[in-house]
Amino acid sequence: MKTYLVGGAVRDGLLNLPVKDKDWVVVGASPQQMLDRGYQQVGRDFPVFLHPESHEEYALARTERKSGRGYTGFTCYSAPDVTLEQDLARRDLTINAIAQDAGGNYCDPYGGRADLQQRLLRHVSGAFNEDPLRVLRVARFAARFAHLNFRIADETLLLMQAMTHSGELHHLTPERVWKETELALQTPSPQVFFQVLRDCGALAVLFPELDNLYGVPAPAKWHPEIDTGVHALMALAMAARLSQEIDIRFATLFHDVGKALTPKVKWPSHHGHGPAGVPLVAALCERLRVPNALRDLALLVTEFHDLVHTIQCQPPTELVALFDRVDAWRKPQRVQQIALTSEADARGRTGFENNPYPQGDYLREAWRVVQSVSTKEVVDAGFKGMAVREELTRRRIAALDAWKQVQ
């Protein structure tokens, strides 16, 4: 019975990155032997155990054989005669197929350390194409390690393209697609995830709303990058610079989907694309079962981002109506979120990356002004019922009007 550290812990250690979770593989042991040593079994489909003290996961070495469609169609075989090399062979990428024993020695039968040095994401074997989820996982790793200059091996990208064209991605559940997307949105370069999906054809399958933006032009004066799909990923990259919140990143990515609905005869103008895109974002979020908080912000950003770009020209009545519409009184964080998504949109353009975005500060300051209006004073003045809301609105508009006079 031998125990090895495997997977991400070994990979990240070799990259001198922080090691968060440790996974172990046990060779030459049976489930009963693990139980006798105090381990707690938690795996149903294959034997995975929790260490009695560290509670880290220890999995018995196993092989996997394709027995059905999709990412769940596998039959696992786990027994004391399964070797470490056989267990590592079932893993997705060579950089994830490195093991380390208690003495610090590496078992690296598939060249993972060499690929780490070459900054290469390469599949272990042809069995890679048996699990369609791996297309998304590789895209996520590309996003996670883009800042270290990792790239996908040509042969791996070709395999991902073949997997997409085979229709296997249609067997992925919405929950798994969203989980990988959610993790990708947390990476330093989330735009790389979606670019890789486009490169292998998967974007059209999983995110057609985004894929449909490619080839849709915008006015060169305002969008030197011209292509709306390119702009969407540039805006996402800027959102990642401005905020760690995936709510902001997600909302920024899909803010322009309504432009795909513009008739070609009206190109490159896209008047009204914000409200037009709201049903598309709603359908996307329902299909992928996106959490409500992310969905709600994305819907608001899609509808109102153009209004925020012209916020300094808007009358006080429009500003108060905007704060009402986004429910800022109960969810004040939305003001900052909408300011940041709009800034990411504005700066996510070729040549605009380092420009200031005064509209964001204007929106925040306007919010500070309306917040200074006291609800208690309105109630104390004798207003009741709906009259309280009406008087609050009147006073907020008056406060903004006075503020705008001195701008």
Swiss-Prot record:
Q: Where does CTP bind?
A: 8, 11, 91, 137, 140
Q: Which cofactor does it need?
A: Mg(2+); Ni(2+)
Question: Which UniProt key words apply to this protein?
Answer: ATP-binding, Hydrolase, Magnesium, Metal-binding, Multifunctional enzyme, Nickel, Nucleotide-binding, Nucleotidyltransferase, RNA repair, RNA-binding, Transferase, tRNA processing
Task: State if Oxidoreductase is listed as a keyword.
Answer: no
Boundaries of every HD domain copy: 228-329
Chain positions recorded as Mg(2+) binding sites: 21, 23
- Source domain of life is Bacteria
What would be an example GO MF term here?
cyclic-nucleotide phosphodiesterase activity
Record GO biological process: RNA repair; tRNA 3'-terminal CCA addition
A Pfam family cross-referenced in the UniProt record is HD
Query: What are the binding positions for ATP in this chain?
Result: 8, 11, 91, 137, 140
| Catalysed reactions, as listed in the record | a tRNA precursor + 2 CTP + ATP = a tRNA with a 3' CCA end + 3 diphosphate; a tRNA with a 3' CCA end + 2 CTP + ATP = a tRNA with a 3' CCACCA end + 3 diphosphate
Keyword DNA repair attributed: no
Tell me which Gene3D superfamilies the record gives: Beta Polymerase, domain 2 (3.30.460.10), cca-adding enzyme, domain 2 (1.10.3090.10)
| Alphabetized InterPro entries for the sequence | CCA_bact, HD_domain, NT_sf, PolA_pol_head_dom, PolyA_RNA-bd, tRNA_CCA-adding_enzyme
Comment field on protein domains: Comprises two domains: an N-terminal domain containing the nucleotidyltransferase activity and a C-terminal HD domain associated with both phosphodiesterase and phosphatase activities.
Q: Which family does it belong to?
A: Belongs to the tRNA nucleotidyltransferase/poly(A) polymerase family. Bacterial CCA-adding enzyme type 1 subfamily.
Instruction: Return the PANTHER family for the record.
Output: MULTIFUNCTIONAL CCA PROTEIN
Record-linked HAMAP family: CCA_bact_type1, CCA_bact_type2
Functional summary from the UniProt entry: Catalyzes the addition and repair of the essential 3'-terminal CCA sequence in tRNAs without using a nucleic acid template. Adds these three nucleotides in the order of C, C, and A to the tRNA nucleotide-73, using CTP and ATP as substrates and producing inorganic pyrophosphate. tRNA 3'-terminal CCA addition is required both for tRNA processing and repair. Also involved in tRNA surveillance by mediating tandem CCA addition to generate a CCACCA at the 3' terminus of unstable tRNAs. While stable tRNAs receive only 3'-terminal CCA, unstable tRNAs are marked with CCACCA and rapidly degraded.
Tell me the protein's name: Multifunctional CCA protein
Query: What lineage is this protein's organism placed in?
Result: Bacteria, Pseudomonadati, Pseudomonadota, Gammaproteobacteria, Enterobacterales
Gene encoding the protein: cca
